[in-house]
Amino acid sequence: MKIEAKFEAKNNKLYGIFSGQEISVDFNSAMPVADFCKVAGDFSAIKEKIPGSAEKVMAVVLPWEKVEPEPEAYDESFLAEFREVLKQAEETELFVVILPCAGENLAEKAEEFTAAMKHTARRIKDCSSVVGFAVPDALASLGFCEGQPAEFFVEELSCKHAHYVYFAKKAAVEKSTLLSEALQLPLVLY
């Protein structure tokens, strides 16, 4: 199932394709996935808190251990619940940027982490409420050049999800590349 893109990254900012408006996402107020799942079906209070445009976009923190509590053992019941809540968000036109996070030593486990997030993307592939994924700081700070963990993360998730937009902290990207190079990346910097 191919989902039509509703958002795009231009000049390192997020824009609605149909509205042409710049859209802000408050990553400082990102909601933990457990809390997001608890409010399923009643997103009106969340939407009211999101300022600005008609396109309401929020960030949801997704810990790696929620997806893969043990090595190579995905929590399919959690992923099914997460998908269901994202489908409910879709019905209310609430959009989500997934902010994956992991514990220490993420750079050493980048391939396993990326595999878990790719698995997550496959499980939520029909959720048009998903704008895209943020690249964790530990990966973004290593660079987006070919063969680097951040580039691998984006490439792996983009394979079957061309409509996703990717996000990264500006400070993390600046650590890895020249600012002029970072500004050329198809990323939304925050």
Predicted segments — roles?
Residues 42-104, 150-161, 165:
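Aromatic-lined substrate-binding rim segments of carbohydrate-active enzymes
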Residues 67-69, 104-108, 141-143, 174-176:
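Short catalytic/ligand-binding loop motif for oxyanion handling, primarily in non-cytosolic enzymes
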Residues 103-122:
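Active-site-adjacent "subsite" loops/lids of carbohydrate-active enzymes
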Residues 26-28, 32-35, 39-42, 63, ...:
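Serine/threonine-rich low-complexity intrinsically disordered regions
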Residues 118-190:
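Active-site region of glycoside hydrolase catalytic domains
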Residues 1-61, 155-156, 178-190:
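N-terminal carbohydrate-binding accessory modules
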